[in-house]
Amino acid sequence: MASAAAGEAEETTRLRKPRFSFEENQILIREVRAHYPQLYGAQSRRVSVAERRRVWDGIAAKINGITSWKRTGQEVQKRWNDFKRRTKEKLARVPHSTQGAGPAAEDAFSAEEETIFAILGPGVAAPGAGAGAEEPPAAPSSQPPPPSACPQRYVLSEDRREDRRADTSAHSKAGSSSPEPWARPSCTPQEGGCPRPKERESPPPSALQPVQLPRLALSPPPPAPPLPPPPPLAQVAPSPPSPPPPPRPPPTLSASDPSLDFLRAQQETANAIRELAGTLRQGLAKLSEALSALLPLLPGTPVDSLPPPLPPPPPPPPPPRPVLPPPAPKVEITPEPVSVVAAVVDGAVVAARGVIIAPRSEEGAPRPPPAPLPPHDSPPHKRRKGFPTRKRRGRWKSP
């Protein structure tokens, strides 16, 4: 039972890989420094995700060359992100730890952290940097890092100092050929202080050749185009001389302004149109005079040059109004009910109710009304025995 538990514990411990050793950290920092432009620098925007993953896999392959276990590119990238995050957090705590009392040895920076500072550049030296954020490299600056963080970077042990010397001597060539100007090894402890970082090396400025721009002088206004001479007209009859065209205003010398040029062109166009209208008017007058002189010379034409105008035609008479026949008297004929008994007495129709209806005469002359009948003792409405006694419904009216 105990052996089984020991086997499970051993199997469990095998699942976790050992921590990164000092040599692995040095290889990781060196390779990231060499490929920093592709991973986080100016070229990272043009590098695809697959290419960036291949770069991390190459770094992991170099680390696996000195170890017996194998690390993947994701593990190597995570180790670098942890390195960077912890370094930024420690740098953010430095100004606060130096203001109060207490030992500052707990915030001492290691050789790896110093190298990470050199890789990330002076942009991460500001306090309050975000933890774990993937920030692009900051622009090179000539300002020195905070003075409070400078003395504490060198609270290192003797073995760290030796490793630091070996690391700086090994990577001096890599630092000289680094693509970024600020990616070079930091100051050494033998210098006795943190010197100011060297400013960005730039090539000596070439002799600036002054470029003289030619002064543009104002061009004079364009001269007005000469007016074309009017076409010659054959004079058939003498005509009075035409009035001379109005004199043109003298051109005023002013600065070359596009608005003035436009107004001047408009004025010239208006003058040309006015002169053309006068020329056409004169030509029409001469043509009418020539026609009036030629019409009497034609055979079969009266002496008068022009016939008198015809009188306007008289307006048409209004249409006759239709004659309407005289209105006939309206005669309303009311149908008598079936139950009314009528009798003919002396040619007159006498209803049972005592109403006398005069018959129509053939000649159209009305007859005199007959004498009224004597009153009857029997009631006027007498129901015959042959009529049915049922009730009438619908549109029939009862008598």
UniProtKB/Swiss-Prot annotation:
PROSITE patterns hit by this protein: MYB_LIKE
Compositional bias (Basic residues): 381-399
Domain Myb-like intervals: 12-84
Keywords: DNA-binding, Nucleus, Repressor, Transcription, Transcription regulation
Compositionally biased intervals (Low complexity): 127-136
Localization per Swiss-Prot or TrEMBL: Nucleus
Biased composition (Basic and acidic residues): 156-170
Region (Disordered): 87-108, 127-261, 297-332, 358-399
GO MF: DNA-binding transcription factor activity, RNA polymerase II-specific; DNA-binding transcription repressor activity, RNA polymerase II-specific; identical protein binding; RNA polymerase II cis-regulatory region sequence-specific DNA binding
InterPro entries referenced in this protein's UniProt entry, alphabetically: Myb-related_repressor, Myb_DNA-bind_5, SANT/Myb
Skewed-composition ranges (Pro residues): 137-149, 219-252, 305-329, 366-377
Main localisation: nucleus
Domain of life where this protein originates: Eukaryota
Pfam families: Myb_DNA-bind_5
Gene Ontology BP terms: negative regulation of transcription by RNA polymerase II; regulation of transcription by RNA polymerase II
Motif (Nuclear localization signal): 83-86, 382-385, 390-393
Comment block on domains: The proline-rich region is required for PFN1 interaction.
Task of the protein: Transcriptional repressor; DNA-binding protein that specifically recognizes the core sequence 5'-YAAC[GT]G-3'. Dimerization with PFN1 reduces its DNA-binding capacity.
Entries under PANTHER family matching the protein: MYB-RELATED TRANSCRIPTION FACTOR, PARTNER OF PROFILIN
Protein name: Myb-related transcription factor, partner of profilin
Taxonomic source organism: Homo sapiens (Human)
